[in-house]
């Protein structure tokens, strides 16, 4: 017979390698695989490894021009998921050479680009990634990180407080700026553009930036504290986005914001580099994340999106609340909160962490708790998230019966009371409600808030 051995072949012959010892430079992935009936797990795992690296559906003669052993992804371990029939965790190792340096975009295109529509699988979910040191070092990461942010803001030893300005759509720029001023004047550290606020007919971005900057400087002068407003620079093109960031820098404001999933990783990394070069902090909103991470058996877990963001760059990222209106299981949430903040995180399956991750001194990201939280949640939030976090109360500030500024006062008083109680050694988990009640005795603003949002 002439030629090479053509034809469709079993993936597992080439791509299932249980004896493989993973290298320090490999990118490791943990996939939750649900094969179609009759497809053995080894074949399904191997198919994932193949389709997300060098494989194609049939043997091609150009395979002979390269070294498959050097470039192929390998499925090196498979384990059944306890309590689920026909679900498996497939571990895949990718050689580092398959990826462009410093590009989250390319990393995702390779690992999750094609394989999720694969016929042999009923469903596929990327649960976790281990990014090797060598690859982490090709990324700039967050523009500034937690420590630098605290130094810029001169705020230490407590979580930071924020508030999303509502109604999210429809306010004029001047009224918007007024709401910003009231919240900051009342005692919040930050206010935030809603993720949908870009540049719409009722409020163009330049007008908003101007009035928010005015609000910020006025509040700063009156309180003696550094204030910020996350100016949303997200736009339809990268060029327009940078134009907005440049204007923010010219106004001298401390922080801008970006929707990193809808904006895309290329745009996000571009903005992140600009922010580091120009001393702007970068707040990241995760609009669209639930499209990707909500299904338990298909898509990508948020911890992967969080890791990707730390590589691409951002100083704050929304990461669920554990207590408010959006779902988030406590241990799992704490797992990816640690992945955002810490330099080194040990493998811990009970918290959903499949791999030990070393960030080799890449700056950390502040997790932002936001969504349906109010003053009664403050002790729990302080305890769960600790000092390095941003607690965002949108309705929990603006919904105060006396207005925005008293709403801000209520939140700040509640926070300071919780931090003080914790520092005195009291247990926030069991005494939380009592701590808030005590504080509300001398703060009418807090008392009114406690009344509106009963525990």
UniProtKB/Swiss-Prot annotation:
Substrate binds at residues 114, 164, 168, 286, 318, 370. Mg(2+) binds at residues 192, 194-195. The record marks 325 as: Transition state stabilizer. InterPro entries: RuBisCO (IPR033966), RuBisCo_large_chain_AS (IPR020878), RuBisCO_lsu_C (IPR000685), RuBisCO_lsu_C_sf (IPR036376), RuBisCO_lsu_fd_N (IPR017443), RuBisCO_lsu_N_sf (IPR036422), RuBisCO_lsuI (IPR020888). This is Ribulose bisphosphate carboxylase large chain. The basic functional RuBisCO is composed of a large chain homodimer in a 'head-to-tail' conformation. In form I RuBisCO this homodimer is arranged in a barrel-like tetramer with the small subunits forming a tetrameric 'cap' on each end of the 'barrel'. It comes from the Eukaryota. RuBisCO catalyzes two reactions: the carboxylation of D-ribulose 1,5-bisphosphate, the primary event in carbon dioxide fixation, as well as the oxidative fragmentation of the pentose substrate in the photorespiration process. Both reactions occur simultaneously and in competition at the same active site. The disulfide bond which can form in the large chain dimeric partners within the hexadecamer appears to be associated with oxidative stress and protein turnover.
